[in-house]
Swiss-Prot record:
Residues 260-359 form a coiled coil. The keyword RNA-binding applies. This is U1 small nuclear ribonucleoprotein component SNU71. The gene is SNU71. Component of the U1 snRNP particle, a subcomplex of the spliceosome. Residues 43-71, 299-335, 407-464 are annotated as: Disordered.
Length: 568
């Protein structure tokens, strides 16, 4: 069982690392397990380090405020994000310019100081008495990998001073102070020209440019710059805090060195990963530049490479042609040049048309190929798809039969079905009549022969064999014909109705669905066997007996459902 110790966090934070643990309870001490002491000690160390760091930051911020208060008196930041900066009205667009190739590493505070310096310069050169006047309203920027593009929006209230301020900025960034250049759109340039038309331009000495360059250089080296912030962020990103609770099985004397080794190992892994990533990015950038170079070379070859590549041939041809052209008159030479240009233009047009036709043909061929390939795959798997989806397709056909859009020529169909029913009834009534007419001659023959036989029996009593035989045969034929006609007359309507129900059952596909439902697999042989059994025996009990071996106790339910579907 783990022992319990008593610790005093207050003594530990005050620096008394010897007496902060006790084995007996004391006032101000809290109980804790011995195995949890390293983790608790680490949390106290982190709390002390954060407290010391906060104190150092507060002292440094106070000293920086006192040091920078005399040198720069910056107001609140005029930076806004790019979405809020976008000009809405035409007046805002005319009062917006940008500084391209602005150096990295200044930070938002540094760019604010640059904006204040530009305001001071404009007020000084335009001799504005009010020191609180601000020409620059707000600014924003776009990161362009190696440089920044800073967008500046001036106050709309200034009209006359705006043109002079833009002239001062153009002169300030004329020679490319630290690579910075002033850019504006055509409407803004025309607006500035209209404002400054007829007024003398303000001169700007070199000292102002030098001071501005020195300001940018100084701001880039300040501790609050973007480069140093990125460095601090990169260093803080690889700091690790090892969980001591996972190392509770190890002795406390070796925990510090083990934690240092773990942090060093993980930091090394992160560093190697960063170096690998930077190397991949550099290679990718190099590859991208190489691809762009190849693209530009290809464009040069397609546009003017043929002319450069065939320079020697062109020179030799030109020398030969010069000798011929010298013999022509001036008019012939002009006609020759015009004809040559016309032929070249036709050739270029034909080549362009040929290229467009080739591209269109390739596109159409690709589309046809893809469509034919899809059609081939569909036809190749048609039987499998049809066999696999036979049940859902039959259900879909049943649903489509009840669809209102399927109800085309419904009255004609109903009239035809009624006519078919009447034909079936008439046919069933005519068949027994035909059979009865076929048996009528036999009965007449019997009626004619019977009196003769009776007279013969009266006259000749001994002739029994010769006269009895035809009489018996005729009577048998008559009785057999009557029984057959009666049976056919009785069974014909019933068999026709049963056969009609069986056909409807066969067309509905109910038997297929039930077999697939109870078996889990569609068996066409079993379905055909069920129909043959129903047609042959016309008995529910016989079908149930035959299906008992296949469906076991489900056969009565299956047969009853089949019979219900057939009786509907």
């Amino acid at each position: 069982m783990d022992t319990v110790l008593f610790v005093s966090p207050t003594l530990y934070c005050c620096g008394d690392t010897k007496n902060w643990q006790s084995q007996v309870p004391k006032p101000g001490y809290v109980p804790i397990l011995k195995s949890d002491i390293p983790k608790f000690e680490q949390s106290l160390k982190q709390a002390n380090s954060h407290r010391d760091h906060d104190k150092g930051n507060s002292v440094a911020s106070k000293t920086n405020e006192t040091d920078n208060s005399d040198e720069f008196k910056t107001s609140t930041s005029r930076y806004v994000d790019l979405k809020s900066f976008l000009p809405i009205s035409l007046e805002q667009q005319l009062h917006t310019v940008c500084l391209a190739h602005f150096p990295l590493g200044l930070g938002s505070k540094g760019i604010d100081k640059v904006m204040d310096r530009l305001d001071n310069l404009i007020r000084k050169k335009l001799q504005v008495e009010d020191n609180e006047t601000k020409f620059i309203k707000q600014w924003s920027y776009v990161d362009c990998v190696n440089t920044l593009t800073v967008y500046i929006s001036f106050q709309e209230s200034i009209v006359e001073e705006y043109g002079k301020a833009i002239q001062l900025l153009e002169k300030l960034f004329d020679n490319g102070s630290d690579g910075i250049g002033l850019h504006m759109d055509e409407n803004t340039r025309r607006f500035v020209c209209d404002l400054t038309e007829g007024s003398p331009a303000k001169e700007l000495d070199e000292t102002a440019k030098d001071e501005f360059s020195a300001l940018i250089t100084m701001l880039r080296s300040e501790p609050g710059s973007i480069s140093q912030e990125k460095g601090l962020a990169g260093n803080s990103a690889v700091e690790y805090n090892v969980d001591i609770s996972t190392l509770s099985d190890l002795p406390s004397s070796s925990l510090d060195q083990l934690c240092k080794d773990i942090v060093e190992f993980r930091t090394r892994v992160i560093t190697l990963e960063k170096e690998k990533r930077n190397k991949e990015l550099a290679e990718e950038e190099k590859r991208r530049k190489q691809n762009l170079k190849h693209i530009f070379d290809r464009i040069k070859v397609t546009n003017g490479g043929s002319e450069k590549g065939s320079a020697p041939e062109a020179e030799s041809d030109s020398e030969d042609s010069d000798d011929e052209v010298e013999g022509y008159d001036d008019e012939d030479a002009d006609d020759y040049e015009a004809e040559k240009k016309r032929v070249q233009a036709e050739r270029d047009a034909q080549e362009a048309q040929y290229e467009s036709m080739v591209h269109s043909f390739q596109d159409s061929l690709l589309v046809q190929y893809s469509s034919l390939r899809q059609e081939y795959q569909r036809l190749q798997n048609y039987e499998t798809h049809l066999q696999k989806n036979k049940g859902p397709m039959l259900k879909e056909l049943l649903h489509l039969a009840m669809d209102p859009y399927h109800d085309h020529h419904r009255p004609y169909k109903e009239s035809e079905s009624k006519a078919d029913e009447e034909d079936r009834k008439r046919e069933s009534e005519e068949v027994p009549k035909k059979k009865a007419t076929e048996t009528e001659p036999e009965t007449e023959l019997e009626l004619e022969l019977e009196p003769e036989t009776e007279t013969e029996t009266k006259l000749v009593s001994d002739a029994d064999a010769t006269t009895a035989a035809p009489k018996i045969k005729l009577a048998l034929k008559k009785s057999i014909g009557k029984t057959k006609n009666e049976i056919e007359e009785e069974e014909t309507p019933e068999t026709d109705a049963f056969q009609q129900k069986l056909n409807l059952l066969r067309e509905s596909g109910v038997v297929e669905e039930l077999v697939k439902e109870y078996l889990g697999v569609y068996e066409p042989d079993l379905v055909s066997y069920i129909f043959e059994n129903i047609e042959e025996h016309q008995s529910k009990q016989a079908l149930e007996t035959e299906l008992t071996e296949t469906f076991d106790e489900d056969s009565p339910v299956l047969v009853s459902r089949i019979w219900e579907a057939m009786e509907q």
